[in-house]
């Protein structure tokens, strides 16, 4: 079953960013919406027609979090037979002591939205600071509180920069949360000479994945992508492979087909 992140279709969706999607108010990223973009309520049917069975949805692609709108989107997903695999909450810094209380409350409201949408998981950001054992414990405590308050949605974190910028910190965070929080492994976030070694140290802990291939004007870095996928497969991973495309070519659907073919070449 094909899975995709809505970020991969940001251009298809008219580059829409909700005007109140930031913790501090206003949009969480710069950019202007373009006319003629696909409405989010029409995305489930578009996914169905192209063979996708599940979606990871960026929070800023939601134009409204009213109960009525969330209900409409849940019905549209159900009618198309598309599962909401993960709500990706793409703002917030739990590691910032001046903002952490406000961020935790804000994330709690997004977890309520995830529950209303029937999402299986919600991915939360941890923070931009350098990791220390004390900071990891503090952030883990906040994540555990959020998980306890929202048991109907599984919280996952991602191997990103900052607090979770290396395998040791990711493993420490999962250990400190005592199983209350899972891992979304992103194959494109890390680089450098130790990339595959670092991915190998966390791959067996992952329950969902961003299958992200780097693209340039000359095409995909297929060698790196295949190597990353093999690391995942050799660790016994059998969860979703959510396709992530953010390369220069505007033909997002075609590039997603290419990524899917590369995934099948490794996973079958």
Model regions and ranges:
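Acidic-and-aromatic substrate-binding clefts and catalytic sites of carbohydrate-active enzymes
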Residues: 34-36, 57-72, 92-102, 128-134, ...
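N-terminal pre-domain/capping segments
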Residues: 1-109, 115, 167, 178, ...
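Long hydrophobic alpha-helical segments typical of transmembrane helices together
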Residues: 222-228, 233-267
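Hydrophobic faces of well-ordered beta-strands that scaffold small-molecule active sites
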Residues: 2-9, 55-57, 84-89, 122-124, ...
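A structural motif
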Residues: 49-53, 118-119, 152, 206, ...
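Active-site acidic/histidine proton-transfer and metal-coordination neighborhood
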Residues: 76-182, 255, 262
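Conserved, mostly hydrophobic/aromatic
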Residues: 4, 47, 77, 114, ...
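Acidic/histidine-rich catalytic cores of soluble enzymes
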Residues: 54-55, 144-230
């Amino acid at each position: 079953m094909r899975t995709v992140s809505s970020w991969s279709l940001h251009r298809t969706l008219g580059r829409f960013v909700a005007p109140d999607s930031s913790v501090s108010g206003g949009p969480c990223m710069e950019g202007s919406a373009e006319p003629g973009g696909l409405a989010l309520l029409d995305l489930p049917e578009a996914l169905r027609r192209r063979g996708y069975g599940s979606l990871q949805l960026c929070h800023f692609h939601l134009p409204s979090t009213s109960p009525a709108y969330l209900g409409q989107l849940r019905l549209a997903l159900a009618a198309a037979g598309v599962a909401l695999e993960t709500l990706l909450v793409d703002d917030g810094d739990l590691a910032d002591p001046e903002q952490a209380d406000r961020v935790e409350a804000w994330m709690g409201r997004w977890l309520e939205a995830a529950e209303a949408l029937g999402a299986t998981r919600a991915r939360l950001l941890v923070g931009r600071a350098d990791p220390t054992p004390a900071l990891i414990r503090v952030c883990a405590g906040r994540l555990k509180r959020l998980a306890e308050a929202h048991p109907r949605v599984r919280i996952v974190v991602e191997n990103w920069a900052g607090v979770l910028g290396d395998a040791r910190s990711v493993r420490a965070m999962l250990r400190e949360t005592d199983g209350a929080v899972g891992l979304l492994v992103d194959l494109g976030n890390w680089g450098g000479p130790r990339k595959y070694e670092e991915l190998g140290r966390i791959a067996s802990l992952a329950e969902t994945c961003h299958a992200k291939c780097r693209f340039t004007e000359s095409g995909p870095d297929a060698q790196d992508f295949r190597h990353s996928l093999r690391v995942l497969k050799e660790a016994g991973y059998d969860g979703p492979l959510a396709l992530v495309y953010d390369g220069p070519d505007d033909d997002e659907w075609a590039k997603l087909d290419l990524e899917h073919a590369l995934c099948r070449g490794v996973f079958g």
